[in-house]
Amino acid sequence: MPLSATADTSKTVKLERYNSYLRKIHSTKVLNASSKVLFRATLLVALVLVLIFAINYPPLSDSRAAAAHHLHRRSFLSTGLFSSSSSSSSIGGAAWEKRVRQSSTAKRPHGLSVLVTGAAGFVGSHCSLALRKRGDGVLGFDNFNDYYDPSLKRARQELLEKQQVFIVEGDLNDGPLLRKLFDVVPFTHILHLAAQAGVRYAMKNPQSYIASNIAGFVNLLEVAKAANPQPAIVWASSSSVYGLNTENPFSEEHRTDQPASLYAATKKAGEEIAHTYNHIYGLSLTGLRFFTVYGPWGRPDMAYFFFTKDILHGKSIDIYRTQDNQEVARDFTYIDDIVKGCVGALDTAEKSTGSGGKKRGQAQLRVYNLGNTSPVPVGRLVSILEGLLGTKAKKHLIKMPRNGDVPYTHANVSLAYKDFGYKPTTDLAAGLRKFVKWYVGYYGIQPRVKKETSHAEDSA
């Protein structure tokens, strides 16, 4: 074989080997690239699955409030604004928007358009009915959690629906839902009454108080500051902010830096947050410090309510005494008086001064006590209930726990009287008579309640 032919063959073999080597390198790069793409795709799918799981399942916790929040979030995401369904009856649909507008539209000239959060609650339902009765537009908002019997909240909802007040079911931390409501309705006012209530429960489930009373409040303020126009906001603080204050009666200028419970601390935090949003964004904000509200359609976790239940069922009731063996006293305030205070605050609330999330001028910032001004020992409350129910209570006197509660409350309401004419008119005996009448009727109990014998009490 000629030398030239041998050389050509050798070159050909080397070239083929080189090309083979290049093909191997290319294949390896393709494989590596494919692996990276596959890994990223797998990671993306995993993240999507985690998101779906988080939306559709409540946390592995015994927190009832947290579970309720996740359930309502799931309901909104699956049937509401982000749903592919075209059903007009779902949240965000045409029929839903029509109900929202109709409920929010005032029936009187220059009437208010009010978003009432916690509308299925005790104070919220009464305020919603009062506003509707005088011709204001009212849209309710509530998450119907199970802190106490949800069937009572549903019964209040039925009362409101009979007066054409629609309640949107949702959570305060659901920003898209709140923004949707403000897209549909230019609310003039917000009456913010939604909150996680209860002093003792805060020791068992502190997270629910942070989620509702702080995070939920901030979320509502964030939506309100961006609204056009910005609404004026009246919201429920609490007499509990006075905490370990020893000055008597409690006045708005007294110190509130010693909360005795987490519930009180969240309400105090709310007052500071309100100041911040007023200062930075020009939101008009009025805080109302309620003092032990009672009356028909009340909360089952309140002493007067479960005392009534236990007395009728022959169960023993615990009556607290202070550590130095004094009677515990509360400034019990009848619901109708609280409603008058809420409406008065709404009527005197000035417009917010912000626009597009920016402050344009000084805005109104207020805080008021709403109480009865007449503290009554808890033992006296029990005696009144015994007389109304015709049954002696089985009393168990115990020392009040050192942590979480306070021995007495006493409201000075002179500022609320001065600014919007707030004046409580219902004493405890008259108010409890109205509550007991409602209680035996609502729960279908054979009436053993004594008839009214005092014209003075009847007209109180």
Swiss-Prot record:
Optimum pH is 7.9. Active from pH 6 to 8.9. It comes from the Eukaryota. SUPFAM superfamilies: NAD(P)-binding Rossmann-fold domains. GO terms for cellular component: endosome; Golgi apparatus; Golgi cisterna membrane; Golgi trans cisterna; trans-Golgi network. Keywords: Carbohydrate metabolism, Golgi apparatus, Isomerase, Membrane, NAD, Transmembrane, Transmembrane helix. Its main location: Golgi. Belongs to the NAD(P)-dependent epimerase/dehydratase family. Gene3D superfamilies: NAD(P)-binding Rossmann-like Domain. The keyword Membrane applies. One of its GO terms (molecular function) is UDP-glucuronate 4-epimerase activity. It is an enzyme of class 5 (isomerase). It is found in: Golgi apparatus, Golgi stack membrane. It catalyses: UDP-alpha-D-glucuronate = UDP-alpha-D-galacturonate. The chain crosses the membrane at residues 41-61, 111-131. GO terms for biological process: defense response to fungus; defense response to Gram-negative bacterium; galacturonate biosynthetic process. This is UDP-glucuronate 4-epimerase 6. In roots, leaf veins, siliques, flowers, pollen and stems. Involved in the synthesis of the negatively charged monosaccharide that forms the backbone of pectic cell wall components. Its EC number is 5.1.3.6.
